[in-house]
């Protein structure tokens, strides 16, 4: 019997893998590299109605921080009155893509009709286990105000009764389940705001697909003992690889999933050993996949990758950015028999939208109704460092913010976490040193110059649940000697640091100073506070930085340090967020 995928030819006589026959847009020149395509003039491919190369221009890096550069469109098209009311134009920088009204409306209808996991087409064993995982990882969900998961009390069943799918989980699971087991290639883009539960939005369909394949594939009894990789989740950083793997690995005991994390600390020997026992879900980076072709220990890596049926590319706007697209695209080309490709992103920059639609013309978009919106429950507070009493000292303004956070009586008895973002990585140690030496804070400084092991060690305390404090703060500062002050040219009233700041030194704060290297995807559990020491350069950076707090509809506080020359769009951010308007 002819294999199902034989009608999707890949290899030509010259050995070049042709993806055009499966909906991918690629060069027809056998042996030509994607790099040459990047530099060449695009040729129209009339058969596939797309360009024959990834649409990425050679742009100079902005050189700021550790983050990848993003596109900055100069489009000045005048928006309609309705668009003006629904979209916030972010200064002079390139706009994020506006969501398709039809797609957003369809998502709203689905969310209004489906409010329980039992209404979604998921295998019962998969649904129950993944709901348990969600419960164990949820700190506070808007539907769980009165019930908190406590593993020691084993109240997961009670917790699950109150657990509801997030809007993007509802939409993504519903849309993918309709054709989950259809044999043709299916390419989808899952787009939703930060902290909306996107990991589970792609993980549930992935696991459901694997378990259904085991049930429906007659040859599974033979395949299950083969050295194969069945699915891969790709991420841009090893911090995200670690985070996603911690979730995926919880599926092993109950569902019999063989999971594997292939990061910077993994050896090729370890990969080979894991492969012998079958890998159901591998979490890694594009670079690690491509490295398979450079070692002799792994025989015919193309055969291994040809067994992959389900691919997830998380933080897709980064992985298809100019700096990553060559590796990411090459990685996908080696997976010849894919059934599902899921791209996942919290932001859809216009350049990314052009790239993905040209590389994958058949891509279907699944978007949250709240795409490109900052959680309206977040409090956005502007602090003008040029005004008295700071007189141009951003460090003093930052110290006052941290003092205010320490005294705000939110989550009493628990350690508080604050993440501070700066634009330049050179400023990270400077800011951290001042906070530690002058104000006695427990500060961690992290940049891309740190090794993977160092970064993972530094962020671990911020990813674990908040610690309960066993000692009380000093009582030296009392209501009688505390001074309340209004910050000039801001919308916040805080307490002034007293001259005797011994109580201030005994802080329960844990502070992380970093750049945009940690602005994407990282789930800082229990982090209610984000400080933007510098104004973000792009709307993408703004959305991702602010998205480190207020996750899963929790409340968070964001402090933005500004100056006299602050632009009007910065002043408008608090109003835009409170009105729940999309940022474009």
Swiss-Prot record:
Catalysis: reaction(s): ATP + H2O = ADP + phosphate + H(+)
Positions annotated to bind ATP: 192-199
Residue ranges of the motif Q motif: 162-169
The keyword Hydrolase appears for this protein: yes
Ranges where the Helicase ATP-binding domain occurs: 179-366
Transmembrane segments: none
Compartments it resides in: Mitochondrion
Keyword Ligase: no
Motif (DEAD box): 314-317
Biased composition (Basic and acidic residues): 63-79
Domain of life the protein comes from: Eukaryota
Region span, Disordered: 28-92
Residue span of the annotated presequence: 1-49
InterPro entries: DEAD/DEAH_box_helicase_dom, Helicase_ATP-bd, Helicase_C-like, P-loop_NTPase
Record-listed E.C. numbers: 3.6.4.13
SUPFAM superfamilies for the chain: P-loop containing nucleoside triphosphate hydrolases (SSF52540)
GO molecular function: ATP binding; ATP hydrolysis activity; RNA binding; RNA helicase activity
Family: Belongs to the DEAD box helicase family. MRH4 subfamily.
UniProt name for this protein: ATP-dependent RNA helicase MRH4, mitochondrial
Originating organism: Kluyveromyces lactis (strain ATCC 8585 / CBS 2359 / DSM 70799 / NBRC 1267 / NRRL Y-1140 / WM37) (Yeast)
Lineage of producing organism: Eukaryota, Fungi, Dikarya, Ascomycota, Saccharomycotina
Gene name as annotated: MRH4
């Amino acid at each position: 019997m002819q294999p199902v995928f034989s009608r999707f030819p890949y290899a030509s006589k010259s050995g070049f893998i042709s993806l055009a026959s499966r909906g991918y847009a690629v060069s027809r020149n056998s042996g030509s590299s994607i790099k040459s395509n990047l530099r060449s003039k695009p040729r129209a491919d009339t058969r596939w109605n797309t360009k024959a190369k990834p649409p990425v221009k050679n742009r100079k890096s902005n050189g700021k921080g550790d983050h990848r550069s993003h596109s900055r469109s100069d489009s000045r098209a005048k928006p309609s009155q309705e668009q003006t009311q629904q979209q916030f134009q972010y200064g002079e920088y390139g706009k994020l893509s506006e969501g398709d009204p039809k797609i957003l409306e369809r998502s709203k209808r689905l969310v209004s009709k489906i409010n329980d996991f039992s209404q979604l087409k998921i295998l019962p064993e998969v649904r129950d286990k993944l709901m348990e995982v969600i419960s164990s990882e949820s700190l506070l969900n808007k539907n769980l105000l009165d019930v908190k998961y406590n593993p020691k009390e084993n109240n997961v069943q009670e917790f699950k009764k109150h657990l509801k799918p997030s809007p993007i989980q509802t939409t993504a699971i519903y849309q993918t389940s309709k054709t989950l087991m259809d044999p043709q290639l299916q390419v989808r883009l899952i787009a939703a705001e930060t902290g909306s539960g996107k990991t589970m939005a792609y993980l549930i369909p992935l696991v459901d697909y694997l378990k259904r394949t085991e049930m429906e594939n007659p040859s599974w009894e033979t395949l299950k003992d083969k050295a194969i990789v069945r699915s891969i989740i790709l991420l841009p950083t090893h911090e995200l690889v670690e985070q996603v793997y911690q979730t995926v690995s919880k599926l092993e005991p109950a569902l019999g999933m063989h999971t594997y994390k292939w990061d910077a600390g993994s050896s090729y020997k370890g990969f080979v050993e894991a492969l012998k026992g079958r890998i159901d879900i591998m979490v890694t980076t594009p670079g690690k996949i491509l490295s398979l072709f450079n070692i002799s220990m792994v025989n015919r890596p193309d055969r291994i990758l040809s067994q992959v049926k389900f691919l997830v590319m998380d933080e897709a706007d980064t992985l298809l950015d100019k700096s990553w697209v060559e590796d990411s695209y090459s990685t996908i080309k080696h997976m010849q028999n894919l059934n599902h490709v899921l791209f996942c992103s919290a932001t859809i920059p216009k350049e990314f939208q052009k790239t993905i639609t040209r590389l994958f013309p058949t891509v279907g978009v699944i978007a949250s109704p709240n795409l490109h919106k900052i959680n309206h429950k977040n409090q956005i507070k502007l602090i003008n460092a040029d005004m008295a009493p700071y007189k141009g000292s951003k460090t003093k303004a930052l110290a006052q913010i941290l003092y205010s956070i320490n005294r705000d009586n939110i989550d009493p008895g628990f350690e508080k976490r604050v993440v501070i973002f700066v634009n330049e990585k050179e400023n990270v140690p400077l800011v951290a040193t001042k906070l530690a030496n002058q104000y006695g804070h427990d500060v961690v400084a992290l940049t891309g110059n740190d090794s993977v092991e160092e970064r993972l060690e530094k962020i671990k305390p911020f990813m674990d649940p908040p610690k309960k404090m066993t000692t009380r703060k000093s009582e030296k500062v009392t209501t009688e000697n505390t001074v309340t002050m209004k910050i000039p040219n801001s919308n916040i009233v805080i307490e002034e640091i007293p001259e005797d700041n011994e109580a201030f030194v005994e802080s329960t704060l844990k502070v992380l100073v970093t750049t945009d290297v940690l602005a994407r995807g990282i789930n800082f559990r229990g982090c209610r506070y984000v400080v933007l020491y510098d104004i973000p350069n792009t709307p993408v950076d703004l959305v991702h930085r602010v998205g480190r707090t207020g996750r899963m509809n929790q409340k968070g506080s964001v402090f933005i340090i500004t100056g006299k020359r602050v632009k009007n769009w910065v002043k408008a951010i608090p109003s835009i967020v409170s009105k729940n308007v999309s940022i474009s």
